[in-house]
């Protein structure tokens, strides 16, 4: 065979659009292409920014020998035909800010980004990363009109990962041997569940004193604020990007992994018409199943309190977009 005449057969090639080329967006793009999860279109409104990042990552390709491609663009038309859209655009919080403080600043950014991206990729699955996470996910669902199973928010994977990291550091254990579960909104009222946390199958309640467990739980709730205070000029982005990448991979490769995500609830856990962090099965259709874990009356009350905090901000966000 003459090698010059060889024409490869066209194969399935996934495409992910990442809206926002800030720290989280660019790191997510890097994770996806370096792990050969998908080709990436990185979009940002700043001229030259996504193009420069994409060029740098394509140069890295020759060093690390991954196959996925990335392009940078300022135009939504270039994102057409994406299988997954991830919204990371928005202002990050600064030291002393809560995630809810970002509501007014990010509502219109998320609404516009979701509308435009889905206009060119109407069959895509939508993942929201922008804070305040649960509210922004609900908002993106409303403005796009997508089926609820095709919209989700990245928070539970991140919150559970932070709790896992703190347990690993406390016990000197391997993080991959640890399983954790955090429910609720991505904020101060999130609900870590220590009794569902294990190390190689052993409940952490048998390994760590109750007071220390409570300290780890509280540190998990404040994990993002702790990092923002240390960085002073920014907030976390490595772990958020890795968490979003895990969700994208489970969807595109139809892995059906059970991961905690901000998911639309229509009766599960006694909650309706809200996006909140719960364990769910992620596959090629998006959220394929919601798992209801057994909660004590106290845990259920705490979950509903977290939901009410999210619900209060949903109406505010919808009004902001409507007024805009």
Curated annotation (Swiss-Prot):
EC number, as in UniProt: 1.1.1.37
Enzyme class, broadest EC rank: oxidoreductase
Protein's UniProt name: Malate dehydrogenase
Pfam families: Ldh_1_C, Ldh_1_N
Gene Ontology MF terms in the entry: L-malate dehydrogenase (NAD+) activity
Paired cysteines (S-S): none
UniProt record similarity statement: Belongs to the LDH/MDH superfamily. MDH type 3 family.
The reaction(s) this protein catalyses: (S)-malate + NAD(+) = oxaloacetate + NADH + H(+)
UniProtKB keywords: NAD, Oxidoreductase, Tricarboxylic acid cycle
Binding site for substrate: 93, 99, 131, 162
GO BP term (any one): carboxylic acid metabolic process
Residues the entry annotates as binding NAD(+): 20-25, 44, 106, 129-131
Active site: residue positions: 186
Annotated Gene Ontology cellular component terms: cytoplasm
Function description: Catalyzes the reversible oxidation of malate to oxaloacetate.
């Amino acid at each position: 065979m003459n090698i010059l005449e060889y024409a490869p057969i066209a194969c399935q090639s996934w495409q992910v659009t990442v809206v926002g080329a800030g720290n989280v967006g660019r790191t997510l793009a890097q994770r996806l292409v370096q792990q050969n999860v998908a080709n990436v279109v990185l979009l940002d409104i700043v001229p030259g920014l996504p193009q420069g990042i994409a060029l740098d990552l394509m140069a890295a390709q020759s060093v690390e020998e991954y196959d996925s491609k990335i392009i940078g663009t300022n135009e939504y038309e270039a994102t057409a035909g994406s299988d997954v859209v991830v919204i990371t655009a928005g202002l990050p919080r600064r030291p002393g800010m809560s995630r809810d403080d970002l509501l007014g600043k990010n509502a219109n950014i998320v609404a516009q980004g979701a509308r435009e991206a889905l206009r060119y990729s109407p069959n895509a699955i939508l993942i929201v990363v922008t804070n305040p996470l649960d509210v922004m996910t609900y908002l993106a669902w409303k403005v796009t009109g997508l089926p609820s199973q095709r919209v989700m928010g990245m928070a539970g994977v991140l919150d559970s990962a932070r709790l896992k990291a703190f347990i690993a550091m406390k016990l000197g254990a391997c993080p991959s041997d640890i399983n954790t579960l955090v429910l609720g909104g991505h904020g101060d009222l999130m609900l870590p569940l220590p009794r569902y946390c294990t190390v190689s199958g052993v409940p952490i309640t048998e390994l760590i004193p109750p007071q220390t467990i409570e300290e780890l739980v509280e540190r998990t709730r404040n994990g993002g604020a702790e990092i923002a205070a240390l960085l002073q000029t920014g907030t976390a982005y490595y772990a958020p990007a890795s968490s979003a990448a895990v969700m994208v991979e489970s969807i595109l490769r139809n892995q059906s992994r059970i991961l905690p995500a901000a998911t639309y609830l229509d009766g599960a856990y006694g909650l309706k018409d809200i996006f909140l962090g719960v364990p769910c099965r992620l596959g090629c259709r998006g959220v394929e199943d919601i798992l209801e874990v057994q909660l004590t009356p106290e845990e259920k009350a705490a979950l509903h309190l977290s939901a009410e905090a999210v619900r209060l901000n949903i109406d505010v966000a919808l009004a902001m977009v409507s007024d805009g």
